[in-house]
Amino acid sequence: MRVVLFSSQSYDRGPFEEANKTFNHEIIYHNFSLNKDTVSLAGKAQVVCVFVNDQVDADTLKALAENGVKLVALRCGGYNNVNLKAASEYKITVVHVPSYSPFAVSEFTVGLLLSLNRKIHRAYVRVREDDFNIVGLLGCDIHGKTVGVIGTGKIGSNVAKCFKMGFGCDVLAYDINPDKKLENYGVQFVEQNEVLKKADFLCLHCPLTPSTTHIVNSDSLALMKKGVTIVNTSRGGLIDTKALVDAIDSGQVGGCAIDVYEGERNLFYKDLSNEVIKDSTFQRLVNFPNVLVTSHQAFFTTEALCSIAHTTLKSASDFYTNSLDESVIANK
């Protein structure tokens, strides 16, 4: 069958071609995003494959349905960029990759926190410029500190265990469906506000839903310890960026490391080095010396890309043989 990938990059082709040796689909790669203006370029696809910043809204889904598309496959875990209600109305099934490599994201989370705390990214730049002064690079021991984890799916659980067992931290966690197995590792489940109030380091690992949108806002920031460090490798919309900027400016937040941003659709996965970025909130954020921003790369490992490709193409095959695994369906 014909599978059309939107927002594909050079690094997607290898894993998809390798995985396709098992499934034998016809794959077409587009390096531009899917939206209502590019949807016609899906052509006669039977499966449309999209990524985190493709705009799969009602208009786009309507056009896909009119062209006979029955399956939209996300090559990522989240699906907040897809109008699931509209997809169901147009009888389009939406699948995602619920667990491609939880180690990739959890390891990156720990790396961000360590880099921010010990100013490793700034030290690297200094030494490259023959500046060997360490003034301004002071960090703190993570050992013995309290790490708060909101969201204890596979990624959040890995992060919680890493900080508890690897660094000797006190770990407080919150989840609407707590994984009680984590208690065997010494992780303590408490209410969300208690996590916010007690955490020295706060890690966000929950999906973006109406109830979690701007979970970090002016009110929740006011509850936190003065000087808290926040790490977000989940979804940008979990944080009200303007409120975060104000909290950093006032000193309420001591540092922030993010791999996602609520306005990233117009920024990430693009080379804008010769352009003026007109997002003033983002520009203000990245100019703080105690902020570390990466462009949604926490997932980006060889193992994760291979897993994503295999799961995506398997879902395409399974859909058309009526053997699709329920766990990958987003609009059940």
From Swiss-Prot:
Active site residues per record: R235, E264, H296
Location in or out of the cell: Cytoplasm; Nucleus
UniProt xrefs under PROSITE patterns: D_2_HYDROXYACID_DH_1 (PS00065), D_2_HYDROXYACID_DH_2 (PS00670)
GO function term, MF aspect, one: NAD binding
Keyword Oxidoreductase tagged: yes
EC number: 1.1.1.-
Entries under SUPFAM superfamilies matching the protein: Formate/glycerate dehydrogenase catalytic domain-like, NAD(P)-binding Rossmann-fold domains
This protein's UniProt keywords: Cytoplasm, NAD, Nucleus, Oxidoreductase
Keyword hit for Repeat: no
Family, per entry: Belongs to the D-isomer specific 2-hydroxyacid dehydrogenase family.
The name this protein goes by in its record: 2-hydroxyacid dehydrogenase homolog 2
Lineage: Eukaryota, Fungi, Dikarya, Ascomycota, Taphrinomycotina
